[in-house]
Structures are given as C-alpha cells and as structure tokens.
C-alpha cells in the first residue's frame, strides 16, 4: 500500500539527449505561427526590394550580400583580418578589426560545406540567423506573457523600419538570435546555455556586451537570493562564461594594436566613440533646425526610431519585466544613442533590442482581431517600402 506520492526519477544525461529531438519538434510546432508570419513579412519585403532592384537595374543579391558592411565581412571570411583603408575624411582609418569574428567565421564555414560564392553563403548565414532570432524572440515573449504575445513580438521584429537588415549579410541577426536564446535560457534557468550563448553573442558585435551584462545580472540575483543557488556550480559557470567572447576578442585586438584599449582606438579611426549622446543631440538639432542640412529621409527615420526607442524603454520599465531583460535593453539603447557618428544606422544598432517591443506586443495581443488585421499589414507595407528605399535610394548604409 503506497504511503505517499511517487517521486519522478531524475533524467540522466543520455535520456535528456535522447529526448532532445522530441522537445525541439514540440517547441518548433508551438512557434510555427510566429515563424510563418515572420517569414511572410520578410518575403514581402524581399519581393518589394526585388521589384525596385529590377527597375534600378541592380542585382538584388549583390545589394543584400555585397554592400557596405557586407563587403568587410566577406573580406574577413575570405582573407582573414589585416585590411586597413584610409578614410575619405582626413584622419580616419578604416581597420577591419572593428568587425567581430563570429559572423564571417560562419560565412566561411558555410562556404566550405556548400559550393556557393562567399557572398551567397553570407546571405544564407544571415537568413538562418534571422529565422533563429525570430524563434528566440517568440520564445522570450511566450515565456513572459503567453503564446499570442510571443507571436506578435516575432512579427513586429520582422516589420520594423530597418527589418531589411535582417535579410542582408550583416551580423545583427546572428547577434539577436544568440542574445534572444541566451535571455530565454536565463528566464528558464538553463544557466550553462545562457552563459555559452552569451559568450558566442559576444563574438558578433561590440554592443553584444549587453547580453553578457544581462546574464551576469541574472546570476548575481540568483546567488544573492538563494543559499541553495550559491552551491550551484552552473550559475557560477554561466557568470564566468558570459563575458568571455566579448572580452576575448577585445583582448586579441589589443594584443595586435598596441594596448588593452586598441579596439576603441580602431573605432575612433572610423569616427566612432562613446560621448554619452552629445554628438547625437547635436546632429538631431542640425537635422531639424539647420537649413544648411539637406533633408534626408534616412536621418528623419533614424531620429524617429531613436525617439520611439526611448519611449518604448520607458514603457518597458513601467511593465516591470525581469531585471536581466531590462538590463539588456537599457545597455543596447545606451550604446546606440551614446555613440557618435553613423546616425542613420542607429535603428540598425537597436534591432537586437527586441524587448523594447514587448509593451506594443502585449497591447496588440490583447487588441481586437480586426485591429491587428489592419494595423500589422499596414506596418509591414511601410517597412517593405522603406527597406527598398534604404537599399536603392539612400546614400547611407542601412
């Protein structure tokens, strides 16, 4: 006669691995609506871009895969680091060590596996990363506010004004994918995954330090709140792993460029430095008040996205998300706004800051179906049109 409830036997490592494919299929099945909607939004954007490319007599795949930053990534993938070019502005020097290594490494790896041009493998890497990012964004949204919010959150990421970047041979999609899944691992207390993914994210872009700080924040909170957690080696390991990618690359650059601050000196050669937003404010003032500044849609859009990002951050704070999610968002906004130069690219720098859209996703998930059926397609059309403009008519990098 039983004396109490049966206690489930903990799964062994082998049993967990055996069950992994089943769990992945189940998670993919739940995320399918979000991924289908995201893919549809990006296909619409690509279709509009293809139509404009045809009229402009410019190959779409070259524009997406071999322009602006894509050229630098392809060069690193083909030849490694070591390219330095004198800038058009006196005193500027463009050094390819400004670009982090993981995306070109993935690009090169794909080129060794499939017999395609390096430009094409760059696009394949970006598209796979974008799909993984949309899935991770859905997972975070579902974990925090339910399935419907997760679906809307993933779709919103695909119809942002600069969402065309998600289908270019850029590193933002890879960073977003790794960051989203690292945050999801934090939220579900998968500590080793959180640290390992943050480590990889730190090898994608300089602003990926945000996810390392989020993991460190989560680990610190866990260690502070629970005596039991202080004995969990996985939490300590995640905190140790999270910043290693970012710090490791900066250390490597420093060893090749004359000191621990070598990476930041290289960034200064590109005209980029952190000045707490002074240059940003000066530039925005010039855009709206200086008659000598020519009107430029990319600058106006950049300003609009910056203001929207700040407003979204306030709403996110009021929504009181888990502290690691908030830390991640604040750091990304601070880096994007506090850095000088590349003003038209500020929206691109904010692409990984998907938690900023959580308040909007929650509101749309609760709205009437008719409202979302009208509003979201309208936003998608604007996104597709602006994406085509930024690719073929703007004279600044998307």
What are these regions (language model features)?
Residues 41-57, 212-309, 324-329:
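Membrane-lumen/periplasm interface segments of specific transmembrane helices
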Residues 168-174, 346-347:
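Short acidic/glycine- and proline-prone juxtamembrane loop motifs at membrane-interface regions
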Residues 91-92, 101, 105, 113-132, ...:
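Loop-to-helix entry region of an early transmembrane alpha helix in multi-pass inner-membrane enzymes
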Residues 109, 121-144, 311-314:
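Transmembrane-helix motifs of polytopic, lipid-linked glycan transferases
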Residues 117-121, 137-159, 193, 323, ...:
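Transmembrane-helix signature of polytopic, membrane-embedded enzymes
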């Amino acid at each position: 006669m039983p004396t109490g409830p049966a206690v489930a036997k903990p799964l062994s490592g082998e049993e967990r691995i055996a069950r992994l494919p089943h769990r992945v299929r189940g998670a993919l099945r739940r995320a399918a609506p979000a991924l289908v909607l995201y893919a549809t939004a990006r296909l619409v954007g690509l279709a509009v871009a293809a139509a404009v490319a045809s009229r402009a007599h410019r190959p779409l795949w070259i524009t997406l895969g071999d322009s602006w930053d894509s050229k630098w990534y392809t060069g690193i993938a083909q030849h490694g680091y070591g390219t330095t070019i004198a800038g058009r502005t006196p005193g500027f020097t463009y050094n390819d060590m400004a670009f982090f290594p993981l995306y070109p490494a993935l690009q090169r790896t794909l080129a060794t596996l499939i017999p395609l041009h390096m430009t094409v493998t760059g696009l394949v890497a970006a598209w796979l990363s974008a799909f993984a990012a949309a899935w991770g964004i859905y997972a975070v949204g579902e974990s925090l506010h339910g399935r419907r919010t997760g679906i809307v959150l993933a779709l919103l990421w695909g119809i942002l004004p600069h969402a065309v970047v998600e289908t270019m041979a850029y590193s933002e999609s890879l960073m977003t994918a790794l960051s989203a899944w690292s945050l999801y691992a934090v939220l579900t207390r998968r500590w080793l995954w959180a640290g390992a993914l943050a480590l990889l994210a730190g090898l994608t872009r300089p602003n990926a330090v945000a996810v390392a700080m989020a993991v460190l924040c989560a680990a610190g909170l866990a260690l502070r709140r629970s005596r039991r957690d202080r004995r969990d080696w996985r939490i300590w390991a995640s905190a140790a792993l999270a910043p290693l990618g970012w710090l490791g690359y900066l250390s490597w650059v420093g060893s090749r460029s004359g000191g621990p601050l070598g990476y930041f000196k290289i960034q200064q050669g590109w005209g980029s430095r952190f000045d707490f937003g002074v240059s940003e404010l000066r530039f925005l003032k010039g855009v709206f008040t200086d008659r000598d500044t020519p009107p430029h849609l990319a600058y106006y859009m950049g300003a609009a996205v910056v203001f929207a990002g700040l407003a979204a951050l306030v709403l996110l704070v009021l929504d009181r998300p888990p502290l690691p999610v908030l830390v991640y968002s604040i750091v990304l906004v601070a880096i994007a706004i506090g850095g000088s130069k590349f003003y038209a690219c500020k929206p691109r720098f904010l692409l990984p800051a998907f938690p900023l859209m959580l308040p909007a996703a929650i509101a749309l998930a609760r709205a009437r179906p008719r409202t979302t059926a009208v509003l979201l397609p309208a936003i998608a059309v604007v996104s597709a049109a602006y994406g085509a403009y930024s690719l073929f008519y703007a004279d600044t990098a998307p």
